[in-house]
Swiss-Prot record:
It comes from the Eukaryota. This is WAT1-related protein At3g28050. It is found in: Membrane. The lineage of its organism: Eukaryota, Viridiplantae, Streptophyta, Embryophyta, Tracheophyta. The keyword Metal-binding does not apply. It comes from Arabidopsis thaliana.
Length: 367
């Protein structure tokens, strides 16, 4: 029982928090690489190509598996669609970071839970009833988490820990045309992310093989982005050359920890917990970005960051409570239905006659 609880409750939370920390670091590394002149289209092609190579052995295991269903057209169609969504999401996201910063990317990602919740309701993956406290908790927690993330983004307040001269805030940068353009690209990305969650969840219901699906997905993203790169870069072969500097480090780290491990963990979490659960970890990224800035970059810590992080935590745990409440209600309903079915079998005439018929059959054999 304890092992099952750890695998279904503790492990997904721990893994997704670690992945949000990794994503903040990978976005910062990507920004440093693009400042050296690397094309972000080429970056996407190489990082997802590396992930596909790392996951390639999983294809042989899945095709030899007897427990998995056959890879039919419906599944392949959804994987192709997933690759197109992933290509659009990555291009929009990295374009946005290129025009703005990783911190703004973390801030705009707070729109993900709201978009995911709406799409999950539309596709009937989440139920909403104002009469149930679990549904109210999910809606309220989603709004509170988004609000807390925007507090971190837009409100500084007094300095709590002053380690360096005050850095330029998101609010002061909001008048920069490039910053606004970057925010627009990032908003499109974080509308594509919930679509990715929804489609991936549907694929997992039909074909529960995370490594195989992510491998095909990585091939698809690399292929579609390569076509876009041929159009954007033209005959510039120099854009495809990667120098042994921060660009190479960024591609390797993103391919291993981002495209490979991160996507696999998110796919696994989508299969066992659903899209809204996974999306609720996005507001944590802005708090993680602030914490990493204070610890590693010696940024100043403001009271607004502390207030916002507290609000995010309250909203996050409110949604988690609502999800746990729903799971408990479903389990209670299933248990009650099972008990009613057993009682009906015992009370039915056919159930009461099973023993006499068997006894009669035995007596006939001895005659």
């Amino acid at each position: 029982m304890a092992r099952k609880y750890f695998q279904r409750e503790v492990l997904p939370v721990t893994a997704l928090v670690i992945m949000e920390c990794a994503n903040v670091g990978l976005n910062t590394l990507f920004k440093a690489a693009t400042l050296k002149g690397m094309s972000f289209h080429v970056f996407i092609v190489y990082s997802y190509g590396l992930a596909a190579l790392l996951l390639l052995p999983s294809l042989f295991c899945s095709f030899r598996s007897r427990t998995l269903p056959p890879m039919n057209f419906s599944i392949l169609y959804k994987i192709v669609l997933l690759g197109i969504i992933g290509c659009c999401s990555n291009i929009m996201g990295y374009t946005g970071i290129n025009y703005s910063s990783p911190t703004l990317a973390s801030a705009i990602s707070n729109l993900t839970p709201a978009f995911t919740f709406l799409l999950a309701v539309v596709f009937r993956m989440e139920s909403v009833s104002f009469k149930r406290t679990s549904s109210v908790a999910k809606m309220l927690g989603t709004v509170v988490s988004i609000g807390g993330a925007f507090i971190v983004t837009l409100y500084n307040g007094p300095v709590v820990i002053a380690k360096s001269p005050p850095s330029v805030s998101l609010r002061s940068q909001s008048t920069n045309p490039n910053w606004i353009l970057g925010a627009g690209f990032l908003a499109v990305e974080y509308f594509c992310v919930p679509l990715w969650y929804i489609v991936q969840t549907q694929i997992m219901r039909e074909y529960p093989a995370e490594f195989t699906v992510v491998c095909f997905y990585s091939i698809g993203v690399s292929f579609w982005t390569a076509l876009v790169t041929l159009f954007t870069e033209g005959n510039d072969l120099g854009a495809w050359k990667i120098k042994p500097n921060i660009a190479l480090v960024s591609i390797v780290c993103s391919g291993l920890f981002g495209s490979c491990i991160n996507n696999t963990i998110h796919t696994w979490a989508l299969r066992i917990k659903g899209p809204l659960f996974v999306a609720m970890f996005k507001p944590l990224s802005i708090a993680i970005a602030v914490a990493m800035g204070v610890i590693f970059l010696r940024d100043s810590l403001y009271i607004g960051s502390l207030i916002g992080a507290t609000v995010i935590t309250i909203g996050f745990y409110t949604v988690m409570w609502g999800k746990a409440k729903e799971v408990a209600l479903v389990e209670d309903d299933n248990k009650a239905n099972h008990e009613e079915a057993n009682e009906a079998d015992l009370d039915s005439p056919s159930g009461s006659q099973k023993a006499p018929l068997l006894e009669s059959y035995k007596n006939d054999e001895h005659v």
